[in-house]
């Protein structure tokens, strides 16, 4: 007898499992199940046919893949979570009895969760871990600003603070920072680590405001923080070893003072948090710079292909960016946020200091005459030095994004700042702000000038050889032209003699043949005719594009039509948003022009009065 196939025993109905069934199978509570899924990187799935996956149920339920749940059954953490549940019950029992000794024993023997094997499992290679650093560093920088709470303890916040400071020191030592941006959310930083771009956000330092549980669940965030702290420890250790730096970070110069002798660990941690001192290396520092110089020399030898030329230009701009603030000394006023600016300036080779009474780690005072720039964020200053420029903090960010030192006249104290443009815009963006378009045009003009300057230098070096080659080519061309002309004249004379003999034989030819010959001779002669501009009809062009799009849509396969429609909808949405931005910009410009005209009229009235 043939075996009967029961409903939902195969196919999509057997592939998925509800969250309740998964918790029953793993014998875990809701909190432990969530924590286990976060640590293992398992998320709910969306089936193609939800009713079949839910075995006929029309309610929307959270579904997991059955293979993921069976994968969790072999996880050692499941046993630790079950042991924790038993320990929690015993601790509550001892607390209810008032037996503090037994409770302390239970707390001391409380089972700990080890995540080392999960890190190795989720990130088989070091590059895989670097690709996940975006979320890791963003969350750790957020946790480093939290105060001590019931769920987020002081240990977690201090550990997050230490790991983020270590990561920032690596970026400073490797000069890996590429882009910076300030927004309402915080400070955006992008670094290039092992060829991968890592972008993270550092929040603004505002007082902490407690949030409701419906909006923010700190227990779930704590599970992510536990995983990311272990991951960041592994990554920092590998990164420090890759550039031959001692881990955990230590100073290259021993600091002997009364404060350091009394509490050495606290003093060293404060100095490291200052981000203003070089850390200890296991070998000399000039190895990376020498390697970069060798790479640039290799690229200089071969500039024939366009790809190599682009790589050479990018390498040159990158080498200039790494030493953008080299030789400059900055002083930060007390109203300016210290940490992000110190981090940026140190990444690009600058020296920075601040008021020594404000925070530990300052290297020079405000009265130092060698200071080149002072960063101020107030409308006026009582005392100013002639030997330095007083700029607002935006000058630092814009200079880094433009990869050059911008003029400081637009960033003086009290000046209306230019718009702070985002460096994370894509090349295929539909809407480009006019300021950014002007800056791009200026960069292209500078590149052309640089290319012309390079060509002039090459002409100076190899000018004699190229001139000789050009003279030889010109002489060969002139010689060939003269030979061709002589051959043409000889052939023309022979043709004329033959034609005269034919005319003598046939004297009675009509005059029409002569006119035809004259016309043919005129046609054979070269003539330059002025061209006419062809005007395209925009309506016809639009109609043609629509017809082409319709034909293109017909050629799409039936299984890809949904994807094609989604792409078209996305493109339409992007164009609509770009048009809205253009309209808003036009309104703003119109309002500004109106205000300027009103100011001029008011000034004229005052002058006339």
UniProtKB/Swiss-Prot annotation:
Keyword terms, alphabetized: Coiled coil, Nucleus, Ribosome biogenesis, rRNA processing
Location of the protein in the cell: Nucleus, Nucleolus; Nucleus, Nucleoplasm
Domain of life of the organism encoding this protein: Eukaryota
Listed PROSITE patterns: BRCT
Biased segments, Basic and acidic residues type: 444-453, 488-498, 513-524, 533-552, 567-609
One Pfam family cited in the UniProt record for this chain: BRCT_2
Gene Ontology CC, one term: PeBoW complex
Gene3D superfamilies: BRCT domain
Residues covered by the BRCT domain: 320-413
InterPro entries, per the entry: BRCT_dom, BRCT_dom_sf, PES
Coiled coil: 481-509, 539-607
UniProt function note: Required for maturation of ribosomal RNAs and formation of the large ribosomal subunit.
Family: Belongs to the pescadillo family.
Name this protein carries in UniProt: Pescadillo homolog
């Amino acid at each position: 007898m043939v075996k009967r196939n029961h409903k939902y025993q195969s196919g999509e109905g057997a592939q998925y499992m509800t969250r309740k069934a998964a918790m029953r199978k793993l014998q875990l509570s809701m909190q432990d199940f969530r924590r286990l899924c976060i640590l293992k990187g398992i998320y709910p799935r969306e089936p193609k046919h939800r009713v079949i996956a839910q075995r006929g149920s029309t309610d929307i339920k959270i579904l997991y893949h059955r293979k993921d749940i069976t994968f969790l059954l072999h996880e050692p953490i499941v046993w630790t979570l079950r042991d924790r549940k038993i320990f929690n019950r015993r601790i509550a029992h001892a607390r209810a009895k008032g037996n503090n000794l037994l409770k302390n024993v239970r707390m001391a023997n409380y089972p700990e969760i080890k995540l080392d094997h999960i890190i190795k499992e989720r990130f088989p290679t070091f590059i895989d871990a670097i690709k996940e650093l975006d979320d890791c560093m963003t969350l750790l920088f957020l946790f480093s600003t939290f105060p001590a709470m019931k769920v987020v303890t002081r240990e977690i916040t201090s550990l997050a603070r230490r790991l983020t400071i270590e990561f920032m020191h690596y970026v400073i030592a490797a000069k890996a920072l590429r882009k910076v941006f300030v927004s309402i959310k915080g400070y955006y930083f992008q670094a290039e680590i092992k060829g991968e771009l890592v972008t993270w956000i550092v929040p603004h330092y505002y007082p902490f405001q407690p949030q409701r549980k419906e909006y923010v669940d700190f227990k779930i965030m704590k599970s992510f923080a536990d995983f990311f702290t272990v991951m960041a420890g592994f990554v920092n250790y590998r990164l420090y070893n890759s550039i031959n730096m001692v881990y955990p970070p230590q100073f290259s110069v021993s600091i002997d003072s009364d404060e350091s002798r009394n509490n050495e660990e606290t003093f060293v941690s404060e100095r490291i948090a200052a981000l203003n001192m070089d850390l200890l290396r296991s070998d000399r520092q000039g190895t990376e710079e020498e390697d970069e110089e060798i790479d640039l020399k290799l690229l200089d030898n071969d500039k024939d292909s366009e790809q190599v030329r682009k790589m050479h230009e990018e390498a040159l701009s990158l080498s200039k960016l790494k030493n953008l603030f080299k030789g400059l000394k900055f002083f930060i006023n007390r109203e300016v946020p210290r940490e992000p600016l110190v981090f940026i300036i140190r990444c690009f080779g600058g020296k920075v200091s601040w008021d020594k009474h404000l925070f530990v780690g300052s290297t020079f005072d405000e009265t130092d005459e060698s200071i080149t720039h002072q960063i101020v964020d107030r409308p006026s200053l009582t005392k100013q030095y002639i030997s330095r420029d007083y700029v607002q903090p935006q000058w630092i960010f814009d200079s880094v994004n433009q990869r050059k030192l911008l003029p400081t006249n637009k960033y003086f104290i009290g000046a209306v700042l230019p718009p702070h443009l985002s460096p994370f815009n894509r090349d295929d963006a539909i809407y480009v702000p006019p300021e950014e378009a002007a800056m791009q045009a200026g960069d292209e003009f500078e590149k052309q000038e640089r290319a012309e300057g390079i060509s002039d230098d090459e002409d100076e070096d190899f000018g004699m050889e190229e001139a000789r080659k050009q003279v030889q080519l010109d002489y060969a061309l002139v010689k060939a032209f003269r030979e061709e002309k002589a051959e043409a004249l000889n052939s023309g004379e022979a043709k004329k003699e033959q034609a005269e003999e034919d005319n003598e034989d046939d004297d009675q030819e009509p005059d029409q043949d002569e006119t035809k010959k004259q016309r043919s001779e005129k046609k054979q002669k070269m003539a330059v005719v002025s061209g006419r501009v062809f005007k395209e009809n925009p309506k016809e062009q639009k109609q043609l594009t629509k017809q082409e799009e319709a034909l293109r849509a017909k050629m799409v396969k039936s299984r890809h039509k949904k994807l094609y429609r989604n792409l078209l909808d996305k493109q339409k949405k992007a164009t609509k948003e770009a048009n809205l931005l253009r309209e808003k910009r036009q309104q703003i410009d119109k309002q500004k022009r109106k205000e300027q005209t009103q100011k001029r009229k008011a000034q004229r009235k005052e002058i006339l009065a």
